[in-house]
Regions:
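Charge-rich, low-complexity N-terminal segments
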Residues: 1-302
Length: 302
């Protein structure tokens, strides 16, 4: 038998529910190995088919969804007419969500982990590979950012035509901040702490704030092409902006906030959206009241 491998086959950008942290945005790289007999072409499986079939099935099942461990004592889930209602009780408060069922992945087990998601994906992939493939191996891993700060955020983009419109999906994202041309770990750490396990909400989508068990919670709701979305989440796990939460606008927001917090200085922000892609914005002394945003992309598969 022979084994072929594909590193960085795709990036799974999603959010999941945690009993202590609440809603957590995540980005995991997916590596794949297939072991089996060679076919008539002398291959285990054509690389072109891997990208078409296997990448697609992984993206369709996990990417831009909220992963829910339905066997957890923290979860209450019901489904009706292609919509799912969810309540998640955790240390920080209560998360409630109503959304089209396709925007969630309900997983067996008491928690979401690399181990159980890996098994889930291997079972899916096994269904689409040819009979000569005897073994499927998948590795899920975070991007290696060294000591550079990063944050986990969740959000939804109601105006997006694709799956970004889903109200609870997320990313694990790095941030690079340059103050007067020099990289500043101080500001990077400040924003990484500020947006740790955060939900980034648009003020326009905020219906109101009310108390559950004496804890203030925000309620967001909107209609999008895929259907109606509602989310209730503790106020102190939210950060509100007056724009949509696209990475271009988030980069601009961070740059403008930095310029306001440190007058007289110039800032350049590279804000990532998951792995290998993001936006650049500048603000400060050389361009008062303005930001310049642009898209950045790395070598990772997106």
């Amino acid at each position: 038998m022979a084994t072929l491998f594909v590193e960085n086959l795709t990036v799974a950008d999603f959010s999941y529910l945690h009993p202590k942290r609440g809603m957590v945005g995540e980005s995991w790289l997916v590596d794949l190995e297939l072991t089996g007999d060679l076919d008539h072409q002398g291959m285990v499986f054509d690389f072109g088919h891997i990208k078409k079939r296997i990448k697609q099935i992984i993206d369709d099942s996990v990417d831009h969804r909220l992963l829910v461990p339905v066997d957890s004592e923290h979860a209450t889930v019901s489904e009706r007419d292609n919509n799912t209602s969810l309540e998640w009780l955790y240390r920080g408060g209560t998360i409630r969500m109503v959304a089209p069922s396709e925007s969630l992945l309900l997983m067996n087990g008491p928690e979401i982990s690399k181990a159980n998601l890996t098994l889930f994906l291997m079972d899916l992939v096994q269904q689409v590979v040819p009979d000569n493939v005897a073994e499927v191996r998948i590795v899920l891993r975070e991007e290696d950012t060294g000591t550079a700060p990063f944050y986990h955020y969740s959000h939804g983009l109601k105006k997006h035509d694709g799956n970004c419109q889903r109200i609870a999906h997320g990313h694990r994202s790095g941030i690079h901040i340059f103050e007067n041309g020099r990289r500043s770990r101080y500001w990077e750490k400040l924003w990484a702490d500020r947006w740790e396990d955060i939900y980034l909400g648009t003020e326009e989508d905020l219906e109101g704030t009310y108390y559950i068990e004496e804890i203030p919670h925000h309620r967001f709701r909107y209609d999008a092409p895929q259907g109606h979305f509602e989310l209730v989440i503790p106020e102190d796990h939210c950060y509100l902006v007056d724009t949509d939460t696209t990475v271009e606008q988030l980069a601009g927001h961070i740059a403008e906030q930095l310029a306001a917090e440190a007058p007289g200085k110039h800032f350049r922000v590279r804000a990532f959206e998951g792995i290998g892609k993001g936006a650049i914005a500048e603000a400060g002394e050389n361009m008062p009241g303005k930001t310049h945003s642009g898209w950045l992309s790395g070598a990772a598969v997106i």
